């Protein structure tokens, strides 16, 4: 079978070693004679897995003891609603920093539950190049119950590498597309959330890392499934959780730890992204419209000079085992999502095809 590299923005490529282990254990997990998909979430075996999964994530990120980790359902979209329901307090309003599609979507959902102020931090110059230059919001942040931002916008390929400065305000981050891609200081955040389907595992489970003092202030009408205090007290199992997705996350976390932790992960991600951006900048055939300081390590966007060539590129790339390179419908063009599981070989194969395509279509 032809080797395939999956550049999908999500659900995304998973580590081959993780998939191989899951395949090996599928019918007989921990010598129990059953699949992990069939094991009760209340069983001792699964409870031990859940505990170990949290411990592995805590070690990867050096999560402080005064933070709780939740494994929930509903994806990032669910958290768009859960966050204002749990964090809005006496100030009655939140600030959303808008850097693209997903930060805007989260702000629109939050408006159903609280007053929202939006601040557009994305700029575009005369050449059409996007950048984010403002990162200090300490002069306005403390009038809000929390400040929300999305450090990596998958659609446009814009990443904000510096953590926003918000003074004593609560900082909330949607890290769905760059969680575990590099090391960060968790203590600078009040809450981090992420859908699993890019760097953590398969779709179906959502990680929430929340500072303990922010728990217990949910609005009265908050459904129990979105109430962080209720979920903490129930060990994220107020209802039957997505056990197979949880299990796969556990394998991914162990895989990352065995591969050298987040320092090694970041080094590999920097290497992959640098190689691809360097080729784009020197190609004179493809174009990237993100300023170097804001180029995403995870989602590399590019385009040719016309839509017909873009469509031809995507089709021929797929024929050559390079899948899911079509850009999001909002922006068009192409997008190579090179999350943690994408090997360097995949990026090199993409560049080789890009060179060939450019030569044939100039």
UniProtKB/Swiss-Prot annotation:
GO terms for biological process: L-serine biosynthetic process; pyridoxine biosynthetic process. CDD domains: PSAT_like. One of its GO terms (cellular component) is cytoplasm. Pathway: Amino-acid biosynthesis; L-serine biosynthesis; L-serine from 3-phospho-D-glycerate: step 2/3; Cofactor biosynthesis; pyridoxine 5'-phosphate biosynthesis; pyridoxine 5'-phosphate from D-erythrose 4-phosphate: step 3/5. One of its GO terms (molecular function) is O-phospho-L-serine:2-oxoglutarate aminotransferase activity. Pyridoxal 5'-phosphate binds at residues 102, 154, 174, 197, 239-240. Its main location: cytoplasm. It comes from the Bacteria. The keyword Disulfide bond does not apply. The modification N6-(pyridoxal phosphate)lysine is found at residue 198. It is found in: Cytoplasm. Binds 1 pyridoxal phosphate per subunit. SUPFAM superfamilies: PLP-dependent transferases (SSF53383). The keyword Transferase applies. Keywords: Amino-acid biosynthesis, Aminotransferase, Cytoplasm, Pyridoxal phosphate, Pyridoxine biosynthesis, Serine biosynthesis, Transferase. L-glutamate binds at residue 42. Its EC number is 2.6.1.52. It catalyses: O-phospho-L-serine + 2-oxoglutarate = 3-phosphooxypyruvate + L-glutamate; 4-(phosphooxy)-L-threonine + 2-oxoglutarate = (R)-3-hydroxy-2-oxo-4-phosphooxybutanoate + L-glutamate. Homodimer. Belongs to the class-V pyridoxal-phosphate-dependent aminotransferase family. SerC subfamily. Catalyzes the reversible conversion of 3-phosphohydroxypyruvate to phosphoserine and of 3-hydroxy-2-oxo-4-phosphonooxybutanoate to phosphohydroxythreonine. This is Phosphoserine aminotransferase. It comes from Haemophilus ducreyi (strain 35000HP / ATCC 700724).
């Amino acid at each position: 079978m032809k080797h395939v590299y999956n550049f999908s923005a999500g659900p995304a490529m998973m580590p081959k070693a993780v998939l191989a282990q899951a395949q090996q254990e599928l019918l007989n997990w921990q010598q129990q004679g059953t699949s992990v998909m069939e094991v009760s979430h209340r069983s001792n075996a699964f409870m031990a897995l859940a505990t170990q999964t949290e411990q592995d994530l805590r070690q990867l990120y050096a999560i402080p003891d005064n933070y709780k980790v939740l494994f929930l359902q509903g994806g990032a979209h669910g958290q768009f609603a859960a966050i204002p329901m749990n964090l809005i307090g006496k100030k009655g309003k939140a600030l959303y920093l808008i850097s693209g599609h997903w930060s805007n979507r989260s702000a629109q959902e939050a408006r159903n539950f609280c007053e929202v102020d939006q601040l557009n931090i994305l700029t575009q110059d005369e050449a059409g190049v996007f950048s984010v230059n403002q990162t200090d919001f300490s002069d306005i942040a403390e009038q809000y119950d929390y400040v929300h931002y999305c450090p990596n916008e998958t659609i446009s390929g814009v990443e904000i590498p510096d953590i926003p400065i918000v003074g004593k305000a609560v900082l909330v981050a949607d890290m769905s597309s760059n969680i575990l891609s590099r090391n960060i200081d968790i203590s600078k955040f009040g809450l981090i959330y992420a859908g699993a389907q890019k760097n953590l595992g398969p779709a179906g489970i959502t990680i929430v890392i929340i500072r303990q003092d922010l728990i217990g202030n949910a609005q009265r009408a908050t459904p129990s499934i979105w109430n962080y205090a209720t979920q903490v007290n129930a060990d994220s199992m107020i209802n039957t959780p997505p056990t197979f997705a949880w299990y796969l996350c556990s394998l991914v976390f162990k895989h990352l730890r065995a591969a050298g932790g987040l320092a090694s992960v970041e080094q590999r991600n920097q290497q992959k992204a640098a190689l691809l951006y360097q080729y784009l900048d020197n190609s004179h055939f493809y174009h990237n419209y993100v300023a170097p300081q804001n180029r995403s390590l995870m989602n590399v966007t590019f385009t040719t000079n016309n839509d017909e060539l873009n469509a031809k590129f995507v089709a021929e790339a797929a024929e050559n085992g390079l899948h899911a390179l079509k850009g999001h419908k909002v922006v068009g063009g192409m997008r190579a999502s090179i999350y943690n599981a994408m090997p360097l070989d995949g990026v090199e194969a993409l560049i080789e095809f890009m060179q060939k395509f450019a030569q044939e279509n100039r």
